Every structure is written in C-alpha cells, then in structure tokens.
Amino acid sequence: MPPDNELMNELKKELGLVQGVILLTTSLLGTGVFALPELAALAAGDISLWAWPLLIILIFPIAIVFAVLGRHFPHAGGVAHFVGMAFGPRLQRVISWLFLSVIPVSFPAALHIAVGFGQALFGWQSEQLLFGELGTLGLLWFMGSRGASSSANLQAIIAGLIIALIAAILWKGAIKPADITFPAANEITFSRLCTALAIMFWGFVGIEAFTHLSSEFKNPERDFPSALIIGLMLAGSIYWTCTAVVLHFGVYSDKIAATASLPLVIVHLFGIQALWVACIIGYLTCFASLNVYAQSFARLIWTQMQYQPDHYLAQLSPGRLPLHALNVILACCCVSSLVVYALKINLNALIVYANGIFIMLYLLCMLAGCRLLKGRCYALAVTGCLLCLLLLAMLGWKSLYAGCIMAVFTEAKTHGVRRIRWPDSASRDLSDQHLYL
C-alpha cells in the first residue's frame, strides 16, 4: 500500500497564492453574498453591523488553526485527515460521513439560492426552478472535469465582477462612512444578535472545504495559510459592506426574496436593464461556491477509498481528477434536490441545520488541533473549541440535528459496519507529531 504522501501526489499540484485566495473568497461569498445581507438585516436590523465584525473575530482563531493544520498536513481528506491523525482511523471515517451528510441539506439550499436569480429574471416557478437546479448540476460536472486550476481561473473573473458590482453600488449610491450608523451598545439585543450570528455563520462555511484542496497547492506550507486568512478577511469585508448597503436603502422585508435585496438596489440605482447584470453575477457567485464544494466532496470520497485501491471510487481520470467520486456526489445532490422540491422544505431551515453540521466539523477539527499542536496554536485550538461550543449554543435545539447525525454515524462505525484494513501510518503514535508554533 503506498503511503499517504504518494497518494496525494497523484492529484495535480497547480494552485498558487492568488488562485487560493480567489477560490476561498468566491467559495465563502458564493451563496451568501446576495442572500445573507438581507437575512441578517431581517434577523437583527442595525445590530447586524456589529454582528459581522463579531463573527469575524469568533472565526479568526478557528481559521488560524485550519491554516496551520493545512500547512503542515496538506491532504485531500481535509478535516477528516486531521481528526484521523489525532484520534485514529475510526473517528476519521465517522467525520468523513458527517461531512458528506451535509449534502442533503446544504446543496439544495445553495442550488435554490442560485436558481432564484432565474426567478428574478424570467419569473421561473416550481418545475422551472427545479430544471434550473438540475442544469446547474450539469455545469458543476463540466467544471469538475476541468480541474482546480480551471476553476480558479473562472472564479477570478467572478471575484472581479463581485468587487466591481459593490464598488459601483457605493459610487452610484454616494454612500459615505458617515451614512452608516452603528447602534449603541444599550440598543443591542442579545437574542437578536444570536439569531443573526446563527444565520450569518453560513457566510463562513467553506473553510473546511478549502482544506481538501491544500494538497493541490504548489507550495502549501507557504501559500495555503496566507490564502486562507486573506480570503477570510476579504469575504468578511464584502459581507459587511453589502449588509450596510441593504440597511442604507431599507430593502429588507419578509415579502422580499432573500436574494432580491441587492438586485433591487441595483435596479433603483442603474435602471431595470441592470437587473440582468446583477442576476448573472449572483448566479455565478453561487455557482463558484457550489463548484468548490462539489470538488471537495469528491476528493474526500476519493481519499476514503484509497485503502480499497481497486474500487471504482478510488480511481482517477486520465487527467488525475476524482471524476467517479464527483459523479456519485452530483447524483446524490440530484436526488436530495428532488426530495426537497417534493416536500417543499423551507430555505432558512436548511441553512440552519446545515450550519449545525459545519460547526460540529469545526469543533472536531479544533479538538484535533488541541492534540496535534503546541504553543500558541494549541491555545488558539482551545479557544476555537470554546467558540464552536458557543456557536452551537446559539443554534439552540436545531444543533441537535448535527449531534444526532454524529451519534448515528459513530454507532454505525462501532457496530455492524465491515472493517477496512488501514495502514499502520493511519494510527501511528503521535508523540513526535506535535507542532510547537
């Protein structure tokens, strides 16, 4: 059995710093940049102007731990690999399944947001929206077959369009810093702040998926941490700016679709003809996020099948891409989208339940950091654990969904599941693996 490093070398190493920043930024903005500003404004009003900086502060220690782990242990398995190094192969496979379990809730939510722009442009309803979602899955397959570098090049264009659009809104709307009013401390309601944070966390879902691409950086030790931190700060700044715009123009209401606020502002400033531009950019940002996630899920499945090298899902395409795994992922997405359509499940519910799983994954990665890291990074990992617990508490009873999924997979891996032979390196002694940073 080839060692892990040889397995990872089968994937193309074609990403640099700029491409990494672009991939993460567009992934984080993706489905949220048009929807979350209005959802945050609805949940907390002006308080959301404080909520975004607070969320960035909460996420920052977590992001640094992800960056350090991805720098020193680059692997297409991402979080599951880190957890496996810290706690052994059984929990590694549990985490892999936990990450994959987010597909039934996160992908339909993201696809629904994406094709919502078709509704704004063409008045799509019901079956038309469903066909739009299925067509988007076809485009995801096409991009997945082109590799990470091609995705980064496309997403560089998307990132440029997003920044240009926001700059145009600020310029045409003549919005100045003095026009943005932060609420006083005594006006902040803790319950509304927690509600906003629980929804807004969706904007920073993507960090864990980004770690699956760490092994495809040309120089992961140098470029991966920088790409992660720069991308995080850039995405957070754009989210805050968009929320300030939505609040400034007052375009948030229960009667307005989640993705309609910024397009309404654009139509108000530039005329109805600009709606095309807004909707195309909105769709592309959602597509960018979906693209990163689809490729991340495929790489996770591929790494988990490496200990059955003859398996269909363990094979790479001639272009050294895990296309078989990608096919399975997109087929699952197709089925889950059909189920959500048939049952008419609410978008907000999908987002919050998905957030619970992602926060659980972040918590487990922080626990792995506590085991693998020493020094200042150990302290950050402990802080990250506490922050993840706080975020789970903010979700309230809805966080039980993630807990139940975790319990089911843990029980399944303990009883009744055929054991797979793992190499000795997967459960090696970690006494010499701690990093003093």
Regions found by a protein language model. Name each.
Residues 1-38, 42-47, 59-60, 64, ...:
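Membrane-interface "cap" regions at the ends of multi-pass membrane proteins
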Residues 7-11, 49, 54, 123-135, ...:
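Helix-loop-helix junctions that connect adjacent transmembrane segments
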Residues 33-37, 114, 143-149, 273-274, ...:
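Transmembrane helix-loop junctions in multi-pass membrane proteins
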Residues 39-43, 61-137, 141-145, 159, ...:
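Hydrophobic transmembrane alpha-helices that form the core helical bundles
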Residues 42-46, 74-76, 85-91, 215-223, ...:
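Juxtamembrane helix-boundary/capping and inter-helix hinge elements in multi-pass membrane proteins
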Residues 79-88, 120, 124, 229-291, ...:
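TM-loop-TM module centered on a large, flexible mid-protein loop between adjacent transmembrane helices
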Residues 115, 127-176, 187-190, 228-233, ...:
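Membrane-interface loop-to-helix entry segments
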Residues 367-437:
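A generic transmembrane alpha-helix motif of multi-pass inner-membrane proteins
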